[in-house]
């Protein structure tokens, strides 16, 4: 699948104010500065669609983008940014959890993880929470171009092994690089396969 048209629709902090349609939604989330905006821009082919920033914690709203008039790409706030302060972190946590747990249109969640780092407690705890709540999700490793092939394999396998300590099977896993456009086709084809499956129901 190739995206032909993408446009920003709305930003808000209240799931009740999200677009009132039955179109499927695919949400992207990750720790601050994981490369989420760059990945969204890469997937849509629009360099400035999602605002990129070197300042962690920039995205603090639920951002909806309409894709080819048939589905929504949702940019969720990043999690785990300490400098926001306790009250702001709690507010963001509520926004994120309410959207994930209550938004019926959410077809799949993509959890972005910076492949340069070893398994992080905050990521593992979030993935565990998703599993416990039965949320359909995939893991998207970002910034693959920053590592050698052997180091990339080592780090991604470390995450998989950590998850298999408590899980019987792994969710879908994607390796991406916004710089090299690695993983673009695989991610979009996966979304397209879910859309086609939903269309038959």
Swiss-Prot record:
Cofactor: Mg(2+)
UniProt cross-references to Gene3D superfamilies, sorted A to Z: P-loop containing nucleotide triphosphate hydrolases (3.40.50.300)
Alphabetically ordered keywords of this record: Cell cycle, Cell division, GTP-binding, Magnesium, Metal-binding, Nucleotide-binding, Septation
GO molecular function: GTP binding; metal ion binding
UniProt-listed GO biological process terms: division septum assembly
Domain named EngB-type G: residues: 22-197
Binding, GTP: 30-37, 57-61, 75-78, 142-145, 173-178
Binding sites annotated in the UniProt record for Mg(2+): 37, 59
One Pfam family, short name: MMR_HSR1
UniProt record similarity statement: Belongs to the TRAFAC class TrmE-Era-EngA-EngB-Septin-like GTPase superfamily. EngB GTPase family.
Function of the protein: Necessary for normal cell division and for the maintenance of normal septation.
Protein name: Probable GTP-binding protein EngB
